[in-house]
């Protein structure tokens, strides 16, 4: 059954879909919906699409956290506790993870106890019992990538949804989830002592070409008021990792051409808000889920740099047709930085 669900990911006929759905029904009931959406999306669109639930007040509320999976250490548990408090207060619809979900080397398989020790047991509060939509980070690629991508993990925790690249469709807002690790040259040319799992990525050039085409096509076809792109790696950042030149070269032109509102990432272990003077895109880092305090802050144009905090924290957001309200929270629960973006004044920033 494991091989059936994991390996047969791209059916060529609806008969094979029906067969796989029947097999998926033998799993725990809580995983069936995810399995169905996973299979259906893979067979009907280039960029897999997941609908977000409609809300009565016409808004979507969510949290974003990255670089977290350390079995509760390095203040991960404190961040999780504050996320639970904020999540319950906001009655969030879902959580987004910007990657590096399990340190230091991803998961070893679907039975790896780190999944429970670093995810299920840590984010256990009632305010966080919503879907978690996750992208992969470079540390996740050091383990068994297929384990994190497997829908069998949803049998252990029905919140878990992780794919390479996919689309979350909330109608007036869409999230374009991008697998950024394969873009970075050094993981291929200078991996050091790390071993990366490139199954499903090679040949690399073809993988990157297809991913860029899928994201570009999805953005062009989008009629959403808000277009938000999620990836692990920084594009603009004053943190330790700084600018990722490969994304600046290949992904940014697509973001700018398609009027993307925000790019949200992890990778740098901080919370950070930059507004590009060239495009007006908001580059938001939420990578403070656990280990932080790198002590590296590079010089940056003060007109672009709206906020930088070299510590742990997470992002909250509430989005309507007209406005996006965003806040960074720290481990004490205090609001570190808040801002609004309105659509009446395209991408104009109001700092609270």
Q: For each predicted feature, which ranges?
A:
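Non-catalytic terminal accessory segments
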Residues: 9-12, 17, 26-31, 291-292, ...
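Cleavable N-terminal signal peptides of Sec/SRP-targeted secreted and luminal proteins
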Residues: 20, 29-44
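N-terminal active-site segment of His-dependent metallophosphoesterases
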Residues: 42-114, 205, 209, 217, ...
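Extended active-site neighborhood of metal-dependent phosphoesterases/phosphodiesterases
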Residues: 46-48, 54-56, 103-226, 242, ...
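Residue-level marker for buried hydrophobic side chains located in beta-strands
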Residues: 62-64, 95-97, 134, 229, ...
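Active-site flanking residues adjacent to catalytic metal/cofactor-binding acidic residues
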Residues: 66-67, 99-100, 178, 231, ...
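A short C-terminal boundary segment appended to hydrolase-like catalytic domains
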Residues: 305-352
């Amino acid at each position: 059954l494991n091989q059936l669900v994991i390996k047969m990911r791209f059916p060529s006929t609806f008969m094979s879909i029906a067969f796989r759905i029947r097999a998926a029904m033998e799993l725990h009931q809580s995983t069936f919906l995810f399995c169905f959406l996973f299979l259906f999306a893979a067979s009907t669109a280039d960029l897999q699409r997941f609908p977000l639930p409609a809300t009565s007040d016409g808004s979507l509320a969510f949290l974003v956290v990255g670089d977290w999976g350390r079995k509760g250490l390095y203040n991960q548990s404190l961040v999780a506790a504050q996320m639970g408090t904020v999540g319950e207060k906001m009655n969030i619809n879902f959580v987004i993870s910007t990657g590096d979900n399990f340190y230091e080397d991803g998961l070893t398989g679907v039975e790896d106890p780190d999944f429970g020790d670093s995810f299920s047991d840590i984010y256990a509060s009632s305010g966080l019992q919503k879907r978690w939509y996750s992208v992969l980070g470079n540390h996740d690629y050091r383990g068994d990538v297929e384990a994190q991508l497997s829908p069998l993990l949803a049998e252990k925790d029905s919140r878990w949804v992780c794919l390479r690249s996919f689309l979350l469709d909330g109608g007036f807002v869409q999230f374009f989830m991008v697998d950024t690790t394969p873009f970075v040259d050094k993981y291929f040319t200078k991996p050091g002592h790390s071993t990366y799992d490139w199954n499903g990525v090679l040949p690399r050039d073809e993988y990157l070409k297809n991913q860029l085409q899928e994201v570009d096509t999805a953005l062009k076809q989008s009629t959403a008021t808000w277009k938000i792109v999620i990836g692990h790696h920084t594009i603009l950042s004053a943190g330790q990792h700084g600018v990722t030149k490969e994304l600046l070269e290949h992904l940014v032109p697509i973001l700018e051409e398609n009027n993307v509102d925000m790019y949200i990432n992890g990778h740098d272990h901080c919370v950070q808000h930059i507004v590009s003077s060239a495009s007006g895109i908001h580059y938001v880092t939420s990578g403070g889920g656990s280990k932080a305090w790198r002590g590296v802050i590079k010089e940056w144009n003060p007109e672009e740099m709206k906020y930088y905090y070299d510590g742990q924290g997470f992002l909250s957001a509430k989005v309507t047709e007209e406005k996006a309200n965003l806040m960074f929270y720290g481990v004490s629960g205090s609001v570190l930085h808040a801002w609004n973006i309105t659509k009446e004044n395209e991408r104009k920033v109001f700092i609270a």
